[in-house]
């Protein structure tokens, strides 16, 4: 039976081969993220203090923050493929350097370098996916990209635990090896994507152009506030679970539900979310995330905690693929990498502030934190939601501008000073 609305399977089949290669490389890279989850354990077993380990992890965060801006610039100037390969080969070297570091200053420097080089590829990957996929398929493409990302994280730690029993060196070697493999795949099989001619690039001009895009600034502002909420999952949420009397293992099991839901449910959910204006879906997702976290103020049992996770994960699945696709629609083709880098930068910045905010409020009163999460999510939704009739013209809809979007995508590739992505 023929239908106007394409099925999920048909949309996946319509994705170009390079997109699937990018998904494969992303899965391999995230599967091989062996060192960071075990870094605290590795350092403390070598005689370093928890404060030392925290300093090293903070150095990684600072490096990743810098990578968001630099990676977007490189993606638009030297090209997506070269940026991905540069990132993967550099982080492989950084991991081997970290494995041989013995003093705390050397370890901190190596982890900073790993954060910088390891996160350079993200804006380039997101921008390359937008280059390859026309607007009507972008929500599906970014959902598939996130599925590969989360599936790698889901299966990687078990392998890392096995390698750690054979010696921590194998964690570093495995991490470096999978990164280098993704780098080789990028050079051999990925297209270079769009990139700006060198004479067109300029940090000040780029910043001025992005700062003049009010729609994009609203997206960044809303994303920062919702990131402050969502990132409680890796800090205060664990304290909340153990405060209720559950063991740390229970936190791990409850949290694993988030990854399982994303891997198996996010792609099918795009069949629904892609039918609506993107800003409405982003706002709805923000409200669901806020509801899931704010309900922790009432959660006292394991089923209640599971319900909270399901609700905020549903919000994550609704908003994340739509957000990436929407930013790709907003971005001029010659600034696509920098737009993606700026979006990544908001999350990196929130990663610095979210634990501080969460810990302070949790120390005052846990309920105050969870209610604040609901308020911040509501604020993010208000910032992003369209008030004017017809959506205010905030970029192309995933369903309403298919033919127009396709011609816009092709025109952008021809007229923006960019090269053909193939």
What are these regions (language model features)?
Residues 2-16, 191-221, 412:
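Juxtamembrane intracellular "pre-TM" segments in multi-pass secondary transporters
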Residues 12-61, 216-222, 226-254:
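Helix-loop boundary and gating motifs at the non-cytosolic
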Residues 66-102:
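Conserved MFS/SLC helix-loop-helix module at the cytosolic interface between two early adjacent transmembrane helices
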Residues 67-79, 265-278, 362:
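Helix-to-loop junctions at the C-terminal end of transmembrane segments
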Residues 82-96, 280-295:
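Structural signature of the two symmetry-related core transmembrane helices
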Residues 99-110, 297-308:
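Helix-loop junctions at membrane interfaces in 12-TM secondary transporters
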Residues 110-149:
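Cytoplasmic helix-loop-helix junction between adjacent transmembrane helices
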